[in-house]
Amino acid sequence: MGYTETWSGKINRKLIKKLHIIDVAAGREKADLVLKNATYVNVFSGELDTEDIAVAEGLIVGLGQYEGIREVDMPGKIVCPGFIDAHIHLESSLVSPAEFARAVLPHGTTTVITDPHEITNVMGTD
C-alpha cells in the first residue's frame, strides 16, 4: 500500500515499519531483500528446503515467491538461522562477554542464555 508519513501526518516511523513488514509478508509490497533459490535449514523438520526468503526491516517475513528491491540469487548456498545456546556458564569460559561473543558469532551462535549472576561476575566493577 506504500504507507508514508504524509498518509496521516501523525503516523510514527515505528508504525510505518510494522505496516511495511505486514504488507511485504502479504505480498502487497516488495521486500527490502529477497534471497532467491536459497537452501535453508528447516529447524522444525531438520531438513534442507529451497525457496525464496523475503526480508523486510531486517526480519525474515516469508518463504516462497516474493519480489525484492534487492534480490540475491543463492543457488548452492545454505542459509541458517542464528543458533541459540540455551545453557551456557559464561563465568566458566574465563572471558568477558564481548570476548565470548567474538569467539562464538563466527560459528553461528547469536544468542546465549545464562544466569544473571554469571554476567555480573564476568563484567567486573567497571
Identify the residue ranges that each predicted region occupies.
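Conserved glycine-bearing catalytic or ligand-binding loops at nucleotide- and phosphate-handling centers
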Residues: 3
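Histidine-rich, glycine-flanked metal-binding segment
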Residues: 7-34, 39-81
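Metal-associated gating/positioning segment near the N- to mid-region
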Residues: 66, 74-126
